[in-house]
UniProtKB/Swiss-Prot annotation:
Organism: Baumannia cicadellinicola subsp. Homalodisca coagulata
PANTHER family attached to this UniProt entry: ATP SYNTHASE SUBUNIT B (PTHR33445:SF1), ATP SYNTHASE SUBUNIT B', CHLOROPLASTIC (PTHR33445)
Subunit comment: F-type ATPases have 2 components, F(1) - the catalytic core - and F(0) - the membrane proton channel. F(1) has five subunits: alpha(3), beta(3), gamma(1), delta(1), epsilon(1). F(0) has three main subunits: a(1), b(2) and c(10-14). The alpha and beta chains form an alternating ring which encloses part of the gamma chain. F(1) is attached to F(0) by a central stalk formed by the gamma and epsilon chains, while a peripheral stalk is formed by the delta and b chains.
TM segment ranges: 7-26
Encoding gene per record: atpF
Subcellular location: Cell membrane
Protein name: ATP synthase subunit b
Transmembrane helix recorded as keyword: yes
Length: 156
């Protein structure tokens, strides 16, 4: 066999092989590659939209956190105001109670003082009466004694 004929036969066989591959093998491979390219493109678009959605979600979360922090600060400030108001009310109530207790104590002291004064006055009167009786028993001049008794009673 001649080398030229062999090369020519191999070239024909190769051409037939390439034609068969182009007709039966190449189209499914191309369609698989195109499908894969389309899937990759779709995945890239999905990733980009997901990134955008994630950025929007992050921004919304940040705004939401800022709003929550502001609300928390407002709540804390309101609680502090309420605390101060309660403290002021408690102080005022304590002052009112203290004043009532002091007034009651002063009334009680005044009442006890009057009672003690009255008891002392009664004791003095009894002593005067006893001393008067003794003077009268021992005394001869009743006019003088009555003047003394009248003076003592007038002083009481």
């Amino acid at each position: 066999m001649n080398i030229n004929a062999t090369i020519l036969g191999q070239a024909i066989a190769f051409t037939l092989f390439v034609l068969c591959c182009m007709k039966y093998v190449w189209p499914p491979l191309i369609s698989i590659i195109e499908k894969r390219q389309q899937e990759i493109a779709d995945n890239i678009k999905f990733i980009e939209t997901t990134k955008k959605d994630l950025e929007k979600a992050k921004e919304e979360a940040t705004k939401h956190l800022i709003n929550i922090k502001l609300k928390a600060q407002d709540i804390i400030e309101q609680a502090n105001k309420n605390k101060l108001q309660l403290i002021i009310e408690a102080k005022n109530e304590a002052d009112i109670t203290r004043k009532k207790i002091l007034a009651q104590a002063q009334k009680q002291i005044e009442t006890e003082r009057k009672i003690a004064y009255e008891e002392l006055r009664l004791q003095v009167i009894q002593l005067v009466i006893l001393s008067t009786e003794k003077i009268l028993e021992n005394s001869i001049d009743k006019n003088l004694n009555s003047k003394i008794i009248d003076k003592i009673l007038a002083k009481i």
